[in-house]
């Protein structure tokens, strides 16, 4: 938490419980974290209604999963739909078949996300999200490479329990732009 040009900014970095044991079985753990985070957000928004809030990190759920949509109340549209408190600018990136920040069993997921409070989307605030600036950083050096089906996947630092000298992570990083008005 801090201020930028007198506007309050709260950054909340997340790493939610994994899907170990299966998505359905593990979902209650992520919903519980979403509820705890929701209480923190509600408290901040009550005391600072115009605060800019960025929730970011590895949510271990995709943009359309229950923990994000119902737990955090993050939607894909702006202006925000009724009942939503955050915009998820990552949502359109997940609509592309070969896009995501990680793969599991050959399927792309977008667990690494930014969720933005309404105040970051309004033009009158000092700090503003630059529309359509979110992206997944996927340089070739971070990809498996080659000709096989895994060529576009992240080059892991640890694979099957062994350190890979040329590896990076099992997730690609994400970024976005903010501007000061």
What are these regions (language model features)?
Residues 16, 58-59:
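Active-site metal-binding loops of divalent metal-dependent hydrolases
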Residues 45-51, 61-181:
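Metal-dependent phosphoester-hydrolase catalytic domains
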Residues 1-20, 180-181:
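Beta-strand-turn-beta hairpins that frame and shape the catalytic cleft
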Residues 8-10, 52-54, 173:
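Beta-sheet entry/capping signal
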Residues 16, 26, 38-42:
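A compositional/structural signature marking long, glycine- and acidic/polar-rich segments
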Residues 20-30, 55-56, 99-102, 162-163:
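Second-shell loop/turn segments in exported
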Residues 8-9, 30-33:
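Alpha-helical membrane segments in multi-pass integral membrane proteins
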Residues 33-56:
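His/acidic metal-ligating clusters that form di-metal
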């Amino acid at each position: 938490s801090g201020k930028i040009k007198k506007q309050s900014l709260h950054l909340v970095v997340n790493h939610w419980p994994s899907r170990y044991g299966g998505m359905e079985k593990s979902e209650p753990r992520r919903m519980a974290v979403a509820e705890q985070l929701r209480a923190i957000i509600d408290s901040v928004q009550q005391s600072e209604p115009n605060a800019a809030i960025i929730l970011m990190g590895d949510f271990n759920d995709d943009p359309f999963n229950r923990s994000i949509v119902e737990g955090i109340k993050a939607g894909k549209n702006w202006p925000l739909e009724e009942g939503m408190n955050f915009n998820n600018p990552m949502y359109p990136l997940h609509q592309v078949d070969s896009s995501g920040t990680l793969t599991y069993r050959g399927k792309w997921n977008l667990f690494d996300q930014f969720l933005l409070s309404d105040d970051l989307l309004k033009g009158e605030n000092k700090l503003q999200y630059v529309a359509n600036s979110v992206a997944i950083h996927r340089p070739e050096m971070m990809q498996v490479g080659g000709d096989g089906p895994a060529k576009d996947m992240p080059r892991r630092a640890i694979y099957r329990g062994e350190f890979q000298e040329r590896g990076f992570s099992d997730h690609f990083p994400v970024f976005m732009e903010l501007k000061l008005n």
